[in-house]
């Protein structure tokens, strides 16, 4: 029985890891695939893995413009992930909650969620997600005109991205976005030479 249970859990993990790889490679999800995954790995089967799959369901809902559906799955994801061996994924969930709040122009709530995400990236030493969260925080600072804070966040997240050494399509897209936004912040601070050095140097 123990062997069978272990094999079953391994299959559940493989289901979630396959979705994660698909997201990393920039391959769009279909709702049918996600629905099948949610059905095959229920909360009763494994709470943590189910919570991780809920994150992918939330991402799909966000890409289709369904913010309400996205928040529903994000809430489920947080509830299921916390306190399990999959808890390290919760940083990505809080980050996405922050993104939705950001899109709704609720920047105080966005910052609150980004701060929660950073707490978990630090707890689990997840440099890649940490850099993405910092990039999102810098966007919020940029919107309210706090350009110096935005520059600080961008500089830190670029350093962390380089240390993480993740060359996936998803990460490269995020990195280019970081560089472009970093350059805009520097220009607002009239640091034109620094902007050309940072963005132009990375482009070459």
Locate the predicted segments by residue:
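Helix-turn-helix repeat elements of alpha-solenoid scaffolds
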Residues: 23-36, 65-76, 106-116, 147-159, ...
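Residue register of alpha-helical TPR repeats
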Residues: 13, 52, 92, 132, ...
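Amphipathic alpha-helical segments of tetratricopeptide repeats
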Residues: 35-42, 76-85, 116-126, 155-166, ...
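N-terminal leader/linker segments that initiate helical-solenoid repeat arrays
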Residues: 1-32, 44, 48
């Amino acid at each position: 029985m123990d062997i069978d249970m272990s094999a079953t859990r391994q299959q559940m993990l493989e289901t979630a890891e396959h979705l994660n790889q698909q997201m990393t490679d920039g391959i769009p999800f279909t709702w049918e695939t996600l629905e099948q995954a949610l059905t095959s790995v229920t909360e009763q089967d494994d709470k943590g893995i189910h919570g991780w799959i809920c994150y992918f369901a939330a991402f799909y809902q966000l890409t289709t413009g369904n913010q309400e559906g996205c928040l529903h799955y994000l809430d489920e994801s947080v509830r299921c992930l916390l306190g399990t061996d999959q808890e390290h994924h919760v940083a990505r969930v809080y980050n996405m909650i922050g993104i939705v709040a950001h899109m709704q122009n609720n920047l105080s709530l966005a910052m609150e969620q980004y701060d929660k995400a950073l707490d978990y990236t630090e707890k689990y030493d997840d440099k890649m997600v940490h850099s993405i969260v910092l990039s999102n925080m810098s966007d919020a600072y940029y919107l309210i005109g706090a350009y110096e804070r935005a520059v600080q966040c961008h500089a830190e997240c670029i350093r962390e991205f380089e240390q993480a050494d993740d060359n996936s399509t998803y990460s490269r897209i995020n990195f280019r976005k970081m560089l472009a936004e970093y350059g805009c912040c520097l220009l607002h601070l009239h640091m034109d030479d620094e902007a050309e050095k940072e963005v132009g140097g990375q482009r070459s």
